Amino acid sequence: ARRVKLLHNFRNLVIENEMEIASRLTQEHGKVADDARGEVARGIENIEFACGFADSLKGTYSEHASTGVDVYTVRQPLGVCAGITPFNFPAMVPLWMIPNAVACGNTFVLKPSERDPSAPRFLIELIQEAGFPPGVVNLVNGDKTAVDRLLEHPDIAAVSFVGSTPIAKYVYSTGTSTGKRIQAL
C-alpha cells in the first residue's frame, strides 16, 4: 500500500509539473512542444498502470494440485534494477522503467543519456518530493564508463536498455556475462 501511495504522489507531481518537464524537453532536446507534452502524457499513463498493479503482486496457494501436493507461488523483488535510457525520449522511457520496477518492490538506478539529462534529473527530484525513501530511486550520470559500471556491478540484478541495436547487443552480452537479467531494446 505504501508503494501505491508513493507512486500516486509521484503521478500527481508529474501532472502538476507537466509543462515544466515538457519545457525542459523542448529546450534541451529540441522537441516541438506538442511532442514533448505527448511524451510526458504517455509517461503519466505508465505511472498510473504501475499504481494499478502494485498491490496485486502477491503469491498464490493451490491446494491439491496433485495427490498430496500443494503449490505455493511466491513473488519476490529482484533487488536493484537499472535503466539505461536514450537521448530521444529522455522523460518517457524513464517513466516506463522506474514506476514498474518500484511497483514490484525493487530499487532502481537510472542512467540517462548524457546528451539531455535535465528532464530525467527533474523526474528524480519529483520522486524525492513524492516521499520515496532515500536510495529507492537513484540517478547516475555519465557515458560508457557509467554503463560498464552498472553492467559489472555485482549488486545489480537486472538492467533495462532502450537505444540502438549495436549498443543493445553490447549491453545484453556484457550484462548476461555477469548473470544479470537484461532487457535490451
Language-model segment annotations:
Residues 1-57, 68:
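Glycine-rich loop-to-alpha-helix module at the N-terminal edge of alpha/beta enzyme cores
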Residues 9-20, 122, 126-131, 174:
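Generic non-transmembrane alpha-helical segments
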Residues 47, 120-123, 150, 171:
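Hydrophobic packing residues within well-ordered alpha-helices of enzyme cores
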Residues 80, 129-185:
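Conserved NAD(P)+-binding/catalytic subdomain of aldehyde/semialdehyde dehydrogenases
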